[in-house]
Each structure stands twice: as C-alpha cells, then as structure tokens.
C-alpha cells in the first residue's frame, strides 16, 4: 500500500493517477471528506483529517502496512522530514530537512544559483534599523514583494491578524513603503525584488544520485491572478529548446544536493534571451497535470528510483500538450474582461482565445479525465454545496 498525502488538489490527484495506473494500491489523505482525490477509482482507502501528521500517520502505517509515502504540500513535507526513521520500514519519499530548508529560503536558493552561474533578480531584504524610504527611493520599479520563507512567518503574521500574501507588486516607492508598513508590528518584512520581464518558464527535473533521470518543461500561457499566481493554462515546451538553461537547472539542483522532483522556475525574456530565477519548488508543483498528460510521470519516477531502486534515465517521448485549470482560468478571463484599462480589442481577443482553447485537441485538464471521471463530478458537487452554504 502506498500513501498519498494531500488529495485535496489536482496535484495530489495527479500523483494518485500516475501510481494507480501502474497498479499500485493507494491510500489517500485529504483535509476534508470531500477531498478531490478520494473520488478517484485508484484509491482503495481514504482518510480525512487535518490533524498534525504525527498524531495519526504512525498508526495508519502499521494498520495498512504502508510501504511508501508521498506528499507535496510544504507543511506535510516539513512534518514528514521530521518523522523519517520513525515509521519502521516505510519509505518516506520526501527531501531531507536541510535541503528542503534551502529551497524554501529564497536567499539561500539565490546564493546557490549565483554559484552555478544563474542570474537572479536584484533584491533587498528590509531589516530593523534601515532607512526604508532611502532604500525604496533607490530601487527600479515595479518591484515584487514576497516572503523568502513563508513557513517561517505564517504564525507571526496570523498573530497580528495579517494574511500571508504569496506575492504583491508595487509601482512606486510610495506603494512599496505602504506595503512594508503593514508589517511593522511583526518586526519582519518580506523580500523586495526587481520585476523581470518575460514569460514564466518552468523546468522540471527528477534528481537521483546527482543527475536528472527525467526532464520536462513548460511555459505559462495564463495565470490567476493575472498579475502572478497559479498557472491556469500552460503548454509543454520541447526539450530541444532552452537546453543550456536546463543544464544550469540540473547544476543548481546538484549544487544543493537535491534528490527527487523539483521545478526550477524562471522568467524568460525572448527579446533578450535572459533567464531570471524566481524560485525552486522542491516538491510536486501546481502544473504537474500537464507533465502527466504529456507523458512525464514524476510521481512514478520517484517511486521507481527510490523504492524499486532503478537508477537509469527514463526520458520518455513527450507529447505536445496544453493543460487547463478551468476555474482559475475562468477567473482569469473574467478579470481581463472587467479591466477597463485594457483596450476593448485586447479583451475581445482574449475571450475568443479562451473559448477556442476548448476545441484545441492538444488541451487536457487538471481535473477532468475520461479514464477517471469521478473526481470531476465530486468537485462539481463540492462547488455546488459551497455555493448553497454561502447563500443560506
């Protein structure tokens, strides 16, 4: 029995499908009884709990004879890293705590990137005692504001009643200072980065024994929110493109000592040929359904290398695919239509393109699958229930 933690999203669902299609018996965990992955035909047992892992996982491992555990959310990865060695013969297929800490900390990630020759955005880490106004006045705008390690600050922000923002943008020193003042009571401030032009490019690698055994890459076509967030529509990019950068991505992961799956995320400017490192996702990433549909199966590769002990490269012939996360993608087009600052022609072209993509034979979906349709209908039912609760 293999346990997949985090059946609540298309990421967990994709991991379930990859392993289940190869005949592995699966137990899935989700935060709620309506977790997306519980409806998959591949799931033999489901556990709904949001309690700390140490409170329920050891008993579950013993009860079901779990052979291996996979997870993707950062809070699960951190908890599982602490449990390594405490679950008997069960294999915990997550990074060790030290390397995970490196990829979660953007400053440490950028330092490793600089050592292997990867360009990183100019950045400023505000600290107590600095003259923020003077520093802000010296920056080039716009800038992106993000926490170098969100897990480190989540509890401190919550204690002050502040939301954890994934990323914010400022077009001027005044806007930046207003954002930074929000965190004065916490005594901690997010990282400020110069904005990098171009398009989102993700390079995905599975590392084993210091080398990549599987590679894939994609570019973002749309995201939600439009200013930067989750990839709502993306496209596979052939591996004969961006080859030199892929080699650098592998060198970066080797420099860190990474083992397992990771996405190295860039902003790529085709006009100049520049690549700027944004971050490393040291886990199964949000757009992994695209890799799955294109034939790059990273969850299976993790199991194949770590459990079956097969270390040969397994680069398949990849299909030309696009993948769509329908609800966020719909929110994207609604936001574009409502943005009166955009020319009407641009909004109309975006709408026509959005609708035409439903007829594109290359397009697959984050949730819907003819081979495993129940998660889609379970998700629709959950959406209806939430809407009814809001209306009552």
PLM feature spans:
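Flexible, glycine/charged-enriched surface loops at secondary-structure junctions
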Residues: 191-192, 259-264, 312-318
């Amino acid at each position: 029995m293999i346990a997949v933690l985090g059946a609540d999203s298309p990421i967990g669902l994709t991991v379930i499908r990859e392993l289940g299609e190869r005949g592995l018996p699966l137990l899935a965990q989700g935060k709620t009884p309506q977790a997306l992955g519980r409806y998959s035909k591949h799931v033999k047992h489901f556990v709904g709990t949001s309690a700390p892992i140490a409170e329920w996982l050891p008993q579950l491992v013993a009860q079901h004879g779990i052979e291996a555990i996979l997870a993707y959310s950062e809070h699960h990865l951190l908890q599982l890293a602490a449990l390594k060695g405490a679950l008997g013969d069960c294999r915990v297929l997550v990074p060790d705590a030290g390397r995970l800490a490196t990829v979660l900390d953007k400053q440490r990630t950028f330092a490793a990137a600089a050592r292997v020759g990867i360009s990183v955005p100019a950045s400023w880490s505000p600290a107590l005692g600095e003259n923020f106004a003077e520093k802000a006045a010296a920056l080039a705008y716009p800038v992106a504001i993000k926490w170098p390690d969100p897990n480190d600050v989540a509890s401190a922000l919550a204690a002050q009643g502040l939301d954890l923002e994934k990323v914010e943008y400022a077009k001027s020193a005044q806007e930046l200072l207003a954002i930074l003042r929000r965190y004065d009571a916490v005594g901690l401030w997010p990282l400020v980065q110069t904005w990098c032009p171009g398009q989102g490019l993700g390079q995905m690698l599975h590392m084993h024994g210091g080398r990549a055994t599987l590679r894939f890459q994609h570019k973002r076509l749309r995201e939600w929110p439009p200013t930067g967030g989750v990839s709502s529509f993306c496209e596979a990019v052939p591996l004969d493109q961006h080859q030199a950068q892929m080699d650098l991505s592998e060198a970066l992961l080797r420099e860190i000592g990474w083992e397992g799956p990771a996405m190295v995320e860039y902003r790529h400017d085709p006009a100049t040929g520049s690549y700027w490192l944004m971050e490393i996702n040291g886990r199964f990433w949000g757009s992994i359904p695209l890799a799955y549909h294109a034939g790059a199966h990273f969850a299976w590769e993790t199991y194949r290398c770590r459990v079956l002990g097969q270390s040969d490269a397994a680069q398949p012939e990849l299909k030309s695919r696009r993948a769509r996360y329908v609800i966020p993608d719909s929110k994207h087009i609604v936001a574009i239509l409502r943005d009166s600052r955009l020319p009407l022609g641009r909004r109309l072209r975006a709408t026509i393109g959005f609708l035409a993509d439903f007829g594109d034979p290359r397009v697959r979906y984050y949730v819907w699958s003819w081979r495993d349709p129940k998660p889609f209908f379970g998700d629709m039912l959950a959406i209806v229930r939430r809407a009814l609760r809001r209306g009552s």
